[in-house]
Amino acid sequence: MTAFLLLGTAASALAAGELSDPIEVAQFSSGQIGEESDFDSFDDEYDEYQTVADPLYYWNKTWFVFNDGLYHALFKPLATGYAWLIPERPRTWVSNFFINMLFPVRFINNVLTGKFDAAYMEVSKFIANTAFGLGGLGDVTADRPHNWEPERPTADGFGQTLGKAGFGHGVYLVWPFLGPSSIRESVGFVGDYFCDPLTYADLTFLEMVAVRAYKNVNALSLELEDNNYETLTEGAVDKYAAVRDAYIRYRAKKVAE
């Protein structure tokens, strides 16, 4: 199960067109990443404390400690060395390529959630970036973002779609390598996995893991100077609770968009 989910890591986070959900990137999960997201920018309607059942606390806490240690001991040093070695522009090209590749996830979930303007915009951006951005390496729409952004934010994955359909989180979960999730979001990972073109690449299991790991190291390297995960956890009395509550609030915001 873990190996299967590892192959789908960060699909929903990157699908949003952001660099990644900061927590998911930090613990090799979305993001949701990279896009890069700001937990402090929630609308007033989300200021009220959001909660979710956490009956698997000891399982979750164990894997949270594991993921956090792995981040600080391995993934952050790797991303730091990679950022020192490779200039920012090529790393941005790599990020653009993977974001562009996840077009099917965004398009399908925009259609499923009735965001037809966002679906149309995703098609337009995909064609433009693929045709004129060297297969997605360049983001030719970035210079005029107001011309390419739909009225409502684009859907980021099947977890958001399930939430809009009325499915609650279920219980809170933390997966090794993937980071924070829930029953609903874990089911969403499966949908994202099967809509991700990379899933169907002619690669061995180890090659697939290597490609996805590289994708996440690259995304993390672009977040090092403004790392929301570290900002969130460094001053927290209870790092586990801080990450859990921020994640639930973030997903509630995405579902309401």
What are these model-predicted stretches?
Residues 170, 181-226:
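Cyclophilin-type peptidyl-prolyl cis-trans isomerase
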Residues 96-183:
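Mid-length scaffold segments of soluble, non-membrane domains
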Residues 1-9:
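Bacterial N-terminal signal peptides
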Residues 79, 159, 175, 187-191, ...:
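Generic detector of well-ordered alpha-helical segments enriched in charged/polar residues
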Residues 14-113, 206-257:
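N-terminal targeting leaders of membrane proteins
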Residues 127-144, 197-203, 238-257:
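Contiguous hydrophobic segments
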